[in-house]
């Protein structure tokens, strides 16, 4: 995913 505030899960 990434590291956005709504998805703090690493890629």
From Swiss-Prot:
Cellular component terms per the entry's GO annotation: extracellular region
One GO term of the biological process aspect: regulation of blood pressure
Residue positions, PTM Pyrrolidone carboxylic acid: 1
Subcellular location per the Swiss-Prot or TrEMBL entry: Secreted
Tissue: Expressed by the venom gland.
Claim: Secreted is one of the keywords in the record: yes
UniProt keyword annotations, A-Z: Hypotensive agent, Metalloenzyme inhibitor, Metalloprotease inhibitor, Protease inhibitor, Pyrrolidone carboxylic acid, Secreted, Toxin
GO function terms (MF aspect): peptidase inhibitor activity; toxin activity
Entry's family note: Belongs to the bradykinin-potentiating peptide family.
Functional note: This peptide both inhibits the activity of the angiotensin-converting enzyme (ACE) and enhances the action of bradykinin by inhibiting the peptidases that inactivate it. It acts as an indirect hypotensive agent.
Protein name listed in UniProt: Bradykinin-potentiating peptide 11b
Organism name: Crotalus viridis viridis
Organism classification: Eukaryota, Metazoa, Chordata, Craniata, Vertebrata
């Amino acid at each position: 995913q990434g590291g956005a505030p709504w998805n703090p899960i690493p890629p």
